[in-house]
């Protein structure tokens, strides 16, 4: 079954709302669409104010009042944002890190 762009974009919105973040590569597989098509969909959805894009994917826009929007995003929110790419980075990095070479960043924390 193929979806038109309207249906695909609505499903992308649903996935972003459920998961918090989505990756272009994963969406291309789910919808049997090219990565270029998915990137165009995400660009369109960002222009409509539905998602915010990051390299390789998109995330749910954090809602809140103007006071919280100006505050820095906390550790928990940063940790959850783009967690799949961070996990892949952590898996690759853990092979290169030896005892005494780490610091307390959120990417390193995912290795634990």
From Swiss-Prot:
Keywords: DNA-binding, Repressor, Transcription, Transcription regulation. Residues 22-41 bind DNA. This is Putative galactitol utilization operon repressor. InterPro entries: Carb_Metab_HTH_regulators, DeoR_HTH, Tscrpt_reg_HTH_DeoR_CS, WH-like_DNA-bd_sf, WH_DNA-bd_sf. Repressor of the gat operon for galacticol transport and metabolism. In K12 strains the operon is constitutively expressed because this gene is inactive. Residues 5-60 form the HTH deoR-type domain. One of its GO terms (molecular function) is DNA binding.
């Amino acid at each position: 079954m193929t979806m038109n762009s309207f249906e695909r974009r609505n499903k992308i919105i649903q996935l972003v709302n459920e998961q918090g973040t989505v990756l272009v590569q994963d969406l291309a597989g789910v919808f049997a669409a090219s990565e270029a098509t998915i990137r165009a969909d995400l660009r369109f959805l960002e222009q409509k104010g539905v998602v915010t894009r990051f390299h390789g994917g998109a995330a749910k826009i954090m809602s809140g009042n103007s006071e919280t929007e100006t505050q820095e995003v906390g550790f928990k929110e940063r940790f959850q944002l783009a967690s799949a790419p961070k996990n892949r980075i952590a898996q690759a990095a853990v092979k290169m890190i030896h005892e005494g070479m780490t610091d307390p960043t959120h990417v390193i924390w995912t290795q634990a």
